[in-house]
Amino acid sequence: MTEKKNIRENEMFETAKALGRRELLKGSLALAATPAIVSTARADTKVTWKVQAHWPKASGSFNDSLAVLAKLLEERTDGRFKLELYGAGEIAKDREIYNVVRRGVVPMGTISPGYILGEAQAMGLLYGTPGTLRESWEMMHLTKNLGVEKMVNEELKPKGVLIMAEKAYPTELVLKKKITSLADFSSLKVRSAGTMLEYLAAAGASPQQVAGPEIYQAISTGVVDGAHWGAAVGALSMKFWEVAKYHMKPALGFANDAYIVNVAALNKLPPDLRLQFLALVEERYFLRTVEYLQQEARALTTGKTKMGVEVVPFPDEVMKKFGAASQAILKKEEAKGEIAAKGCKALTGLMSDLGYA
């Protein structure tokens, strides 16, 4: 009896072991399948971000910068990541865009760093210090390789915002009146923004802040005598040349436009979508800047040959005033703090290497 009992117990034990192995195998297979399920779920995730632009829909940059970014992002993510685009003022405009992005009202916007100079010590350098650099590639180098964008984000990220340069471009003034002297220039009221306000004021003009969609009317009705919105591309797309035929050279300076993103919204993206987005923005900065230079040449040719635009050099007296103003602005930027001083050192070092200082 004892022997039969032992046999039955052994049989039960072996059966239990077999059942245990089968259950363990089932569990293992289920566990192994989990990453695939998660992966499939992530692959199926679809995201649509509202993007508030500071560009009016008539602006060349709305279509050639933002709309192209949206198109490429949708293509590269197989339709999983879409951008819903809003022109200037549809949700917010100008300086307000930073706050609606920071608060998460919209996850993304475009902006001129000149609208938010007080948000980071090096923001003025990211916007562009008037009268310092002379080519777009120099601004690109300062922004990316010499670290100015990174310096700005050191202060913005803790506030919940990431800024990424969109393109570097020249800033040039268009005027209703032809000027030939410092006295002529000192009589002007001009629309401006950022550190360009101080730069123009130092040379005697009376700069004013006017929102993008309102600039054309301000020029045409005489509220201002001229404006800058980029350079030739902006003047053509915003129709400034219809009412202001004098295009001034050289450039007041070189600036960056930028994308701003809510950090929490960025971090919520599936890793693959986040990677695609960040890589595309970085790629587009270089491609768009170079493309913009060709568009500048085409736009200015159109203005001169078809619209009666005249390219006018700034009088020597005005250029001397600009030179002094540039140095004063640079000193003010440097005095903003340790981060700003580091950025100014990078800028002045570059200028020295280029023979500008």
Question: What residue spans do the PLM features occupy?
Answer:
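N-terminal acidic, proline/glycine-rich, low-complexity intrinsically disordered segments
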Residues: 1-5
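N-terminal secretory/targeting leader peptides
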Residues: 8, 13-38, 42-138, 147-357
